[in-house]
Amino acid sequence: MIGYLIYPATTPRTNNAFSWFCDAAMQNGIELKVFFYNSPQVEEQFKQAPLPDFVFLRGYHIPLAQWYESQGIKVINTSESMILCRDKFLTFQKLDELGIPTPQTLAPFLPSPKENHTPSFEECSAKLSTPFILKQLYGSKGENVYLIDFPESYRQALEQCHAEHLRRIGEKSLNSEFGTTEEEIERGSMVIAQQYISFSRGRDTRVWVCEGKVIGHILRYNENSFKSNFAQGGSFKETELPENGADRAIAAAQALGLSFAGVDLLYLENGDFSVCEVNGNPGFRTAKTDIPQGIFRNLKI
């Protein structure tokens, strides 16, 4: 069996994950070939190459995923599931629709402090209470996420999100993380106001799920910030995952149709968990278990 592991061209070639994936695949009888994409279009290198048995896409190149799907090739993750999990409001809607606990989230809007369509601080706090979270629709690693407790912090966060919006549009690089068209980039630059779960301040549990099974989990924490992300200075350590936490993570991944996912669980006072975000392209450097092995042992091709 042959699979293609496809990364954005911006990925450092020194990334150890390449060998981790390839070694784990080989141990499970799979030959994995590594490719890189450098364009928002489906490049000729993929159209001319022999079709693999499956594609493992380490990025958000939706057109490439759709092209392989049109050829009858299994893509991990599917284009539909990646569209859902990349957009934090679509994620909220799907989880909420299925009754999976997740922070209350208001409809997205453009981050322009001077526009009439931007809700005021008072409007957001009336619906979500204060403090609340402000974040952009597309993004990861805790970037462009703000804790809002006063009108001034709201104004400053909107200005920073607006600057990020202009940067994404102005660069016209069409980075697949933020979209492959200007319309997608515009959508991804919109912001959402979200309920803040104060009981879980600075800590969450990242759960890696593959084909409906938990293959790893880790407690992430930060004593100096409300963000627990490792990329934002957080730390990590092993922890036990209660059955209800595993159930929440599996349900969230399945709700979005993800074969492989990283699910971030917030702690609730009643001992339950709330799904903060679901990542269809999760890293796993902080994992204490062999995530690639877990993937290829459980993957259904």
What are these regions (language model features)?
Residues 132, 215-216, 261, 274:
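Protein kinase-like catalytic core scaffold
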Residues 236-240, 254-258, 267-301:
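C-terminal active-site "lid" helix and adjoining low-complexity regulatory extension at the edge
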Residues 133, 208, 266-268:
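Conserved protein-kinase catalytic-loop segment immediately C-terminal to the catalytic Asp
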Residues 6-113:
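Conserved N-proximal alpha/beta basic substrate-recognition cap immediately N-terminal to
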Residues 143, 147-248:
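Phosphate-binding site of ATP-dependent enzymes
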Residues 60-62, 81, 213-214, 220, ...:
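Short glycine-enriched loops at secondary-structure junctions
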Residues 249-253:
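A conserved acidic, glycine/proline-rich C-terminal tail/linker
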Residues 4-7, 82-191:
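Active-site nucleotide/adenylate-binding loops and adjacent lid/helix of ATP-dependent enzymes
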